[in-house]
Structures are given as structure tokens and as C-alpha cells.
């Protein structure tokens, strides 16, 4: 037998080995993934050669990966029946790195690998990750062309040997003699866990102790017509760690602008609202069935974190690092394609089965609202998916903004909305009175954050979204101009005096007191003067500040609008002349009542004391 040949690693390879061997890694498991990925790649190449070449060594060998463990000898062996390597290929592939070897390249590599060991594979040198756990690595291989087999051997210290080896079948066997602190990689439970996490969907069988351990198929790579509902549901339960079937699933492929295969599921339950805290993203990123990024924060926007599933793209580098994922242009393109496709799917499902979509909306609508407020790029698509009750919708049945548009009056220029704790509370309040009178539909936002959502959306199909508690709402220009003239109410001059007096009396609490052209029956209401901070938005911010221990910051003063036709306001105008002091108490109580109807905070002690004064006056005169 020919003697072993000794080789020195290329200088750049030595540098890389130093990085691998002398650094501490938190993700040591990745070396198993790298070796399995290399085996899968060799098998794929062998499958191609078998189709194009007539003479192939050991042509009847099944294409598979075998893992053998020896706890006593502390070895891990990964074998494949792939394409194998010749002696020269061993030298070229395992002794030389195809890079310029500039100092900056290796400095950057060393720093990045300290943060993320996945970067090793990005440069096509994932094999060297074996030295993370092994103090000696043997590679026994024979090429598919039938040439002499060889053994490559190194301790990762700067040199390697290549020795001819007889009796080898086609393929490659890698034997890792484990370091003292890596003996767990010779135990089947550990290897099973690593395979399940990283290599469950490798397209070739992986056998451990004669048993195939990657039994779940990569359904996303198959045609939809070949897959049953039962297979989809079982796959979802596997990747989503779920017990129930999903409520929605989207399986699609795209070839342009990128090659993408994706299988996404919507769970039936929202675990964030069940007290489990913010859930981590549920979609994993794969490249050719090899896991790149588990629970990826890069492949979908954060507001789609409730989704479970897989995105696979052959266009990505097989071992791209997590740091690179954040800035990678390909990943950004994949993110846009998958996000837009899912939003399109939801829109289609909302039309196909409205009842099922409303169930989805009640469970996961909060995430779509989050998307509107945080992700301008998708606001238009998300706006079509929003659902709210309105003054003309059935009780408890939210509708789309598109449905609202269909019922709009031809001359109506805006979409109006108002927030409240419940539909009943809104309809009992003053803000909808004129809308009812004019038969104008108004959107009911029943969630405290809904005003934030619609203020961020700003418009829908060219129609501006406007909060009905704004000071500049005008539903009828003629009424607005004639607001101070009404024979059934306080006359023009007297009402003007009352407004001036109330503005002075309430100057510490409100920015202005105005005659309302919107109120029909109610005596007064609070309106938002700045056109942005609605009452509900102010409540949300106040609650957030309190939760964070931040001192309260007063917003802009609200305006008080009064209804000169209301009996209480007419009597207040008379009372002001007879008893200005007591009239002041009544004016403050009217303001507090309006504030409470708007959902704003008042001083309860002052309000109760004032209430008793007014009650005492009323009872004493009864």
C-alpha cells in the first residue's frame, strides 16, 4: 500500500481552523448540521450523475445518510453514498479555501463567528466546524467514477495526511473523534435532537441505528394536488407543536423574482392573549430543506408572528448567518413576496367565507392592527382586511371599510368613526346624534387602540378617515352657519353671552366653549381640538404612561360644545343671571359629564362634592 502523503494546510485554512478551534461557541450543534448538509449535497450530485452517466460505481447503493455512534470510543460517524471524492478533490476541498485570504476578510470572519457560528458555512467551509467538537477528524471516501479510495486525516493543527484506502464503497464517511467535553454527540438522544431541529426535512433518509429518523416529509416541496388534508394537518402539528388542526393554510410556490416554496398555517388559538406573553415567530427559514433560521425574525414582519410554517428558497446561500439575514437583499425580497402573498390569500378567504374570516379576525385581528400602525409598506393591503361594527351593521357583526363605502351617500367625502367601550355606550352618547339624523353611517371602534389604527391608516380608497369627536366636523354647512339662530332655544345674543361666561368659568379645564351644530338632544359634548389626539388615543397614552411609571403629560385642552336647544342649557342661561355662583357649579358638572361620556378622566372627589351640592339645591326646592 502506498504510504501516506503529508500536506500543510494553506495559510488561510490555518487561520480559519484557529478561529474554529480556539473560539467558544454556544451553538456547537451546528457542526452536525454542516456535515449532514454536505452529505445531502453529495447525494444530490450523485443523483444527477446517475441520470447522465452510464457507468457509476455501486449503482445499486441506496441514496441515504447513515449515522453511527460509539459511546465507548467517543466517536460520531456520518456516512453517505453520494458522489465521493478523488485524492485531488480531497486536497482541493479540504485543504484549500477558495478566497483571497486578505487580512480584513479573516478579521471580519473571526469577529462574526464569535457572534454566530453559522457564518462558518456561509463561506463554503462548513466541514471545518467538525473541529468544534472533534480533536481528530477522518474522511474516508471513494469517488463515483471508481478510482482509488482515500482517507484524509487531521487533528486541525496545521497539517493533514491523505492515505490510499482499499475496500471502500462509493461515497464518504466522516469519523469525528470527540473532545472530552463533546462526548454527548456519541449519544443517540443528542443526535436525534439535532437532526429534528436542523435536518428534519433533508430529502434523503437519515438512518440512526438502522432507523430512519427524518420521517416527516418536506410537504412544501411537493405539489398541492398530491397532499391530503390529513397530511397537511399532521405536518402542521409537527412543526407548530400543536394538537388542533389549523384554521387556515397557504401553500404556494414562486419562481420569479425568486425561487420560493412556502407552507404557512394559521393556528386556531392566539396564545398571546392567553397569558403566554409575546410569542416568538413561528415560521422557519430553509434553504434546500436545510434549516437556516429557526423562528426567523427576518422572513416575515413581526406582526405576522402568529403564523406557523416554512419558507424555503434555493436562491439563498445554504449557510447564511443570522447577522447577514437582517441586511440580505434576497431575504428582504422573499419577505415582501411571502407577506404580500399571505395578505392576498387572507383577502380571498374573507370573500370566499366571510363567517370563517370573522372568526379569524376576532382571534388575530389585533396583529393586523399592529401591522397598520408599524408597517407603512403594507397599510393598503391591511386596510382591506380590517373589520369594525358600524351604525348600520348587524349587532356583533363587524364589516369591512369597503362595505362602508358601498353604502356611503354620493356626496359624502369622509369616513367617520367614533370610539367607545361598547356599541350601546356609543349609541347612547352625543357623538352619533347628528349622524343618525343625517343618515350617515359611522364606524364604531370598540378597542382602545382602534383610533391609533385608523389615524395611521389616514384614508381608505381615497376617503379620509376622521374621528367624530373632532372639533372641525361639519355635516351640514347651512346648519353650521346658522348655529346661533334657533327660535326653540336660547336666542342668538343670550347664547353668545352664555358662551363667553362659560369660557371664562371653565378656562382652566377647556380651550374653548362653542355652540354645537351637531348635537340634537344632549346638552353638551367634548370635542378634540387638535385634530389628532382623540379621546380614546389620550386614554391609551395615559394608561401606557401609568404602566411605565411615567409622569402624566397633559394633552391639548379639549373644546366643550353646548346645545342651545337643550332645556338644561336654556335653564343655565337663566340661572347665570339669578345665581352666577351656583350656575358655575352646574357648568362644571356639565363639563364633567361630557368628559365622562368621552371616556376622559375627571377628579372624582371634586365631582362628587359638586354633585351633592346640586342635589341638595334640587331637593331643598322640591
From Swiss-Prot:
A cellular-component GO term for this protein: cytoplasm
Start and end residues of each stretch annotated as C: 540-622
Record region (B): 323-539
Keyword Chaperone found: yes
Keywords: ATP-binding, Chaperone, Cytoplasm, Nucleotide-binding, Stress response
Sequence segments annotated as region (A): 1-322
SUPFAM superfamilies per UniProt: ATPase domain of HSP90 chaperone/DNA topoisomerase II/histidine kinase, HSP90 C-terminal domain, Ribosomal protein S5 domain 2-like
Keyword Mitochondrion annotated: no
GO molecular function, one term: unfolded protein binding
Top-level division of the source organism's lineage: Bacteria
Chief subcellular location: cytoplasm
Annotated localization: Cytoplasm
Recorded family membership: Belongs to the heat shock protein 90 family.
NCBIfam families reported for this sequence: PRK05218.1 (NF003555)
Oligomer and partners: Homodimer.
Record's function text: Molecular chaperone. Has ATPase activity.
Protein name: Chaperone protein HtpG
Phylogenetic lineage: Bacteria, Pseudomonadati, Thermodesulfobacteriota, Desulfobulbia, Desulfobulbales
Name of encoding gene: htpG
